């Protein structure tokens, strides 16, 4: 019995593991609050590929979610251009997300249908060093979000931006696709791109060039369809085509004024020359008003009822007055009609002939006698023979 159990145990474990099923790998990452976090999902780190197989030729897709939840946390996004391109997890954590989060990623090989899992342990913490109070957001229309997430394009953007900003350390704070900000999907013609928002922070103040771009005069020129004011050389061109009408500057070094909470008072208004409080109302007796409101309609209704009763009971013409006002010829004609009617009724009542019984077929209308049928109707067939 023990030998049979030892024989079936490895087989059962293999069935539960499934084809291609392996234990999920675990990787620890350290995102920083307020800084962009980018993690590349490569097929080689998930699937056990043969040595001669090139990772770029194997279609692989990914599915990522927060452990114990069906989707990713709010600050984290996933994107992949196609199964032949790597996937990216990117975003910027907020102070509320500080702590430990576990992201479970499953890779699917679209050729062999193999799957592999990986757990990403994110230990989110605060960044070290001085804060970055000066923040600028650019809209780059010449790139998609997948083209800016790798380290090389991001470093090239910071290097090119250093020519427009005063010397200082620049940090990427966030990268967002223009589609996530309400942008439209471009047409697949002319190499059009979706666009990407890149947010950069620095401890150095804004340069004069950036302040001029974000000035009200530049916004007015953009509203008229004209290019904004740019007093310096565009070092981002031609590799990065920036929409200078969509540049926003945020200075967090100046604290925002806190809204004062209104203090509840005692409900008594202070002395105000324009406010005239109402005088005290004297007590009034509403008994007379109530009596007038109720008794006057009742008296009017009573008078109308008495007038109607007098007209109906005391002002009737009477039968005698009606007969006197009627002519004699009309009265004779009327009486004749009544007398003739009574005479006809008496004659009809004195007839000895019984009332006709129309349902009986043997009844004689002229004599009124009842005769038995000559033929026994019970012996007559319903349908006569046809000769």
UniProtKB/Swiss-Prot annotation:
> Topological domains (Extracellular): residue ranges?
25-290
Transmembrane domains' residue ranges: 291-311
- Where does it primarily localize? membrane
Q: A GO CC term?
A: sarcoglycan complex
Q: Does the keyword Cell membrane apply?
A: yes
Q: Which UniProt keywords apply?
A: Cell membrane, Cytoplasm, Cytoskeleton, Glycoprotein, Membrane, Phosphoprotein, Signal, Transmembrane, Transmembrane helix
Signal peptide coordinates: 1-24
Q: Where are the annotated glycans?
A: 174, 246
Question: GO MF annotations for this entry?
Answer: calcium ion binding
Which residues carry the post-translational modification Phosphoserine, per the record?
377
Cross-referenced InterPro entries: Cadg (IPR006644), Cadherin-like_sf (IPR015919), Sarcoglycan_alpha/epsilon (IPR008908), Sarcoglycan_C (IPR048347), Sarcoglycan_N (IPR048346)
| Record topological domains on the Cytoplasmic side | 312-387
Q: Does the keyword Cytoplasm apply?
A: yes
Where does the record place it? Answer: Cell membrane, Sarcolemma; Cytoplasm, Cytoskeleton
Q: Which Pfam families match?
A: Sarcoglycan_2, Sarcoglycan_2_C
Note the topology in the membrane.
Answer: Single-pass type I membrane protein
Q: What does this protein do?
A: Component of the sarcoglycan complex, a subcomplex of the dystrophin-glycoprotein complex which forms a link between the F-actin cytoskeleton and the extracellular matrix.
The Swiss-Prot or TrEMBL record describes its family as follows:
Belongs to the sarcoglycan alpha/epsilon family.
Provide the assembly information: Cross-link to form 2 major subcomplexes: one consisting of SGCB, SGCD and SGCG and the other consisting of SGCB and SGCD. The association between SGCB and SGCG is particularly strong while SGCA is loosely associated with the other sarcoglycans. Interacts with the syntrophin SNTA1.
Q: What is this protein called?
A: Alpha-sarcoglycan
Source organism of this protein record: Oryctolagus cuniculus (Rabbit)
